[in-house]
Design a protein with these regions (language model features):
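Transition segments tied to proteolytic processing and entry into folded domains
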Residues: 1-153
Length: 153
């Protein structure tokens, strides 16, 4: 967790509002990326974002009848809140730090408490017991706040 926190400029609780996929050049090759506009509802760590809404870019998506899947990428669900660890590309566009390792869905448990769940496409990790996912998965939002702040010290 300390590494993920240290590599992230922004750590936020946010909701995905809309997404669009398009072609872009990455490393001299045409690739499909999906940009999701998120509404930042709370800064959990790092610096606050410059705006209340920013774009989060992940590799892969569908443009026309062509799809490109990139394993291990975060999958933001429209309308669903999540905790995101972000690295800015520009002031208004960011990548998810560590791809799916930096995305946690916020889902209600039986007591209506929001709990962090790993991104749906989290790959198999080396030393998973030491990963941020092992520490954060199942934590309430309150517990996650404390864990993130503790890891930042």
């Amino acid at each position: 967790l300390a590494e993920l926190v240290g590599r992230s400029e922004h750590i936020v609780r946010a909701t995905a509002l809309e997404a669009r996929s398009d072609w872009t050049l990455i490393g001299g090759r045409r690739r499909i990326v999906t940009d999701t506009r998120i509404r930042v509802e709370e800064t959990l760590g790092g610096r606050p974002t410059a705006e209340s809404e920013i774009e989060v870019r992940v590799l892969g998506g569908i443009v026309g009848d062509i799809g490109e899947r990139v394993d291990g990428q975060a999958e933001l669900v429209l309308g669903e809140p999540s905790v995101l660890f972000l690295m800015p590309i520009t002031p208004l566009v960011a990548y998810v730090t560590g791809a799916a390792q930096g995305h946690y869905r916020l889902l209600s448990d039986a007591q209506k408490s929001l709990r962090l769940r790993p991104s749906p496409h989290l790959p198999q990790l080396v030393r998973p017991e030491e990963s941020a996912a092992a520490v954060l998965s199942g934590a309430t939002l309150e517990e996650a706040r404390a864990l993130i702040r503790g890891a930042a010290k």
